[in-house]
């Protein structure tokens, strides 16, 4: 009887590995560079959707009372972070979703099979590191305290997520700790990048040029004034400007603009554009008669 039991146990032991190695139907476990690229694209797509909502927390725009989408946006405008409205998806969730995807790529892409000449393990990992840095940077400046050299070591920041662990309990790191992680990701990411400038149709991806732009912005917020200036001066000569005096000039905010360096953020929404109005404070900043930007950016619709 014992012998029969041993044989049965041995059969299960030998077969269990093969069973666990079976990929579930309809699922893809990334093993190739192209598959990790697709995974990272999910991270890119998760990142920018909240950006245009932040204008509602400034003095730039306000929701139109009575508009059909008014209730979807009013909580943002009045800084109501604990809204009873369950349809509101607050900005913190999108960057952390992007970070989840970047962590998946960072952990495993260097062992992936290179199945395309158009991408490399290094490029994909470099982009993932920079996207993770950008997401942490945005979160810190949304929910943490602004950087102050004298208190950053103790000022409350945001939780840092650099690994995939569904049981991990996240606690807020200090502002200095978050910046340390951001700079580490930027440094490693820039060392891995191989693409100087992405093609226009994939310009949401990080390149060597957009990585410089990101570090310049982070250095500025970190009050590294000289480093921020040096990085900006390194980049500016390769960035032409739109001449708004020409009829063929494009909107500098669009992906088609020759000014575009990184076209990642969603800066507007059809629903939001129709359900908000520009504040008098913002309009007052423009010379409405002579400023070319005014005619390009604003249109009167009766609201």
Task: Locate the predicted segments by residue.
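Hydrophobic-face positions in mid-chain alpha helices that act as interaction patches
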Residues: 38, 223, 227-303
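Conserved, well-structured interaction surfaces
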Residues: 72-143, 191-193
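Start-of-helix signal in alpha-solenoid helical-repeat scaffolds, especially tetratricopeptide repeats
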Residues: 93-95, 119, 126, 158, ...
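Inward-facing hydrophobic residues that define packing positions of alpha-helical scaffold repeats
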Residues: 99-102, 179, 186, 232
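Short coil/linker segments at helix-helix boundaries
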Residues: 119, 142-180
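Residue-level signature for tetratricopeptide repeat
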Residues: 135, 216-218
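Sec-dependent bacterial lipoprotein signal peptides
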Residues: 1-17
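Membrane-proximal, proline-rich intrinsically disordered regions
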Residues: 17-58, 62, 232
């Amino acid at each position: 009887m014992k012998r029969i039991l041993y044989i049965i146990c041995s059969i299960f032991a030998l077969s269990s590995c093969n069973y666990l190695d079976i990929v579930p139907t309809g699922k893809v476990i990334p093993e190739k560079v192209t598959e990790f690229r697709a995974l990272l694209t999910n991270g890119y797509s998760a990142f920018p959707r909240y950006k245009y909502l932040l204008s509602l927390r400034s003095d730039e725009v306000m929701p139109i009372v009575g508009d059909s989408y008014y209730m979807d946006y009013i909580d943002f405008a009045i800084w109501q972070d604990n809204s009873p409205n369950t349809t509101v998806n607050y900005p913190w969730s999108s960057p952390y979703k992007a970070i989840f995807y970047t962590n998946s790529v960072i952990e495993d892409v260097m062992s992936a099979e290179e199945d395309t000449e158009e991408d490399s393990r290094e490029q994909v990992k470099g982009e993932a590191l920079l996207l993770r840095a950008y997401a942490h940077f945005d979160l810190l400046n949304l929910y943490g305290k602004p950087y102050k050299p004298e208190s950053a070591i103790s000022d409350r920041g945001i939780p840092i997520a650099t690994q995939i662990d569904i049981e991990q309990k996240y606690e807020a790191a200090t502002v200095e700790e978050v910046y340390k992680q951001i700079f580490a990701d930027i440094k490693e990411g820039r060392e891995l990048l191989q693409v100087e400038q992405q093609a226009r149709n994939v310009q949401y991806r990080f390149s060597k040029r957009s990585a410089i732009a990101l570090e310049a912005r982070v250095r500025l917020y970190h009050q590294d004034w000289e480093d921020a200036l040096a990085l900006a001066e390194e980049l500016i000569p390769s960035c032409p400007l739109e001449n708004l005096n020409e009829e063929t000039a494009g909107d500098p905010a669009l992906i088609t603009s020759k000014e575009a360096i990184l076209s990642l953020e969603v800066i507007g929404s059809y629903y939001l554009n129709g359900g908000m109005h520009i504040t008098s404070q913002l309009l007052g900043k423009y010379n409405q008669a002579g400023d070319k930007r005014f005619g390009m950016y604003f249109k009167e619709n009766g609201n």
